[in-house]
């Protein structure tokens, strides 16, 4: 137990140092920043991965951020297993550091989504449940809605259609008062996906009602 606590202490001290280093890199317009990687990862994914390897070697960014960005790059390359692996690493690092709850929530959402893409629906739902707890603790209704909708999609793919539509409706209700661009885009997307499922199930009148709401 003492060894475990000592390791955690060293990890926390290391994180403090890396946070200061990351701030300095940002101020110097370094390529080893989240913004720079985000700007190039779609057009230059291999270069983005190389820069992340260099950032890790130079200790220029927090490990959880590096693995988060690696996951993002691999997801864009449609390599979801690798994306999940690195998202999981970031999630574990955030859990140990226990000082960036927003990023931990972000990685929990990513893991739920990636597990669903990999058809690991039960795994996805476990992350959904954990993410909803985190989102409620932070009063983040948009994150909660995103997680609920992911659970609804999982239920739909597992053929629990009635439960899926109920979960979709719960997610949509959480966004019903959204007044920001991101929330409104998410609401529109959720309604569109629900409409597609209703049409697939030959529930045309229900689909039209959702379309009018949208």
Can you name each region flagged by the protein language model?
Residues 4-13:
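Sec-dependent N-terminal signal peptides
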Residues 12-20:
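Hydrophobic membrane-targeting alpha-helices
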């Amino acid at each position: 137990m003492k060894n475990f606590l000592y390791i955690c202490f060293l990890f926390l001290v290391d994180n403090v140092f890396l946070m200061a280093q990351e701030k300095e890199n940002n101020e110097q317009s370094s390529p080893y920043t989240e913004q720079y990687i985000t700007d190039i990862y779609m057009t230059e994914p291999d270069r983005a991965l190389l820069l992340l390897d260099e950032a890790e070697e130079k200790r220029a960014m927090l490990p959880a951020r590096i693995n988060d960005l690696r996951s993002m790059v691999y997801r864009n390359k449609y390599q979801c297993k690798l994306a999940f692996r690195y998202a999981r690493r970031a999630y574990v690092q955030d859990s140990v550091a226990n000082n960036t709850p927003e990023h931990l929530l972000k990685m929990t959402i990513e893991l739920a989504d990636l597990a669903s893409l990999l058809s690991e629906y039960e795994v996805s739902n476990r992350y959904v449940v954990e993410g909803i707890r985190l989102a409620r603790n932070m009063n983040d209704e948009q994150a909660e809605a995103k997680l609920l909708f992911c659970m609804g999609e999982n239920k739909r793919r597992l053929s629990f259609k009635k439960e899926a539509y109920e979960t979709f409706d719960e997610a949509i209700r959480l966004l019903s008062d959204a007044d920001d661009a991101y929330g409104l885009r998410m609401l529109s997307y959720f309604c569109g996906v629900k409409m597609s499922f209703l049409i697939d199930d030959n529930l045309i009148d229900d689909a039209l009602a959702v379309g009018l709401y949208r």
